[in-house]
Amino acid sequence: MNVYIDKQNLVSYVHSMKDSRFEDCNSMLKKCCDINFTFTKYDLDQLDQEDDRFSKEALVQIKLWMSTMMQGCKGKVRWGINFPPRPLKTNMHNNFSHEDLSAVYLLDDEKVITVKNMGSIIVDGPGGELSALSQLIINDDNLYTKMFNPRELESWDILDAYISPATDIIIVDRFLALDESLYESNLYALVEKLAIKSKCKLNYIIFSDDKDRASRVAIAPDWDNIRSKIKRKVKNITGYDPNVTFILKYKVEHDRTVFTNYKLFHSGDTCNYFNSKGELITKGRYLNIDSIASKDCRKSCSSFIEDMQAVINDVIRINSDLIKGDKKSCFLKFEQPVQL
């Protein structure tokens, strides 16, 4: 996972060593991240001469931290990385790669707070480094994964502490739309909950089904109505109409998965956890939440995107009418693949 750090942010980060969050964040940087400094080593050496706010003692502290980080650092450390482009733009994520969309940005830019408040990517300015990094630490015991027993859940509110900024929310659950009476308590409640950190135009891509494969009964959900309701409910949270796309009758994915830029959710049962009265009905035994900071999670996310892209390509080839909606995503493409 890439972390981009401006010079002023490095100074601020090292200065926060006494914060209780620092140890875990520092461990994550050392063990899980590729660190990309947007300035050169020479720039760092000149810090105390260029800016009278910084003493030689502060520079010594930074270099001591740097020396400690280099010992056993598992990721790459790069200097003079000219990314992201400056000045920052609120729509800069539109041109990001998949890796860029799941990176952390610690930047000294006049628009950094504006971009942060949009909730599309994890970004913060000087003084906000630990707040940004700690969003990827989700458990005191095992820093990057959390397991719940769904049978003990009271509501979807349990997810509040684990929602991160996002551009895309990809939901895979073939049973999610089979029972209209469960939409409010599950489908709609879930898409709303996943949007709580965002004030931007989100992309929802939902892989589901319009047939109960066990009984082989077609139920014909009103996809246009479902899409309209999702748009309305999410707009009430984010202020923007989301893009909503459904992909139907997929064959290769049985797991119930929710993918976002920084978190991966796995459910052992369909996400229809509650009945129309909000009472728990799931028979699932686990709901796992994994942070992109974990190398294993990053591999799973990469495989997931590849698999879902293959599903889309197959549906386009066989019957493109089974893809309904806006067909917009930062992670998935909806064009006919080029045959070589």
Please name every model-derived segment.
Residues 1-148, 188-340:
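PLD/PLD-like phosphodiesterase catalytic module centered on the HKD motif
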Residues 133-187:
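A structural/positional concept
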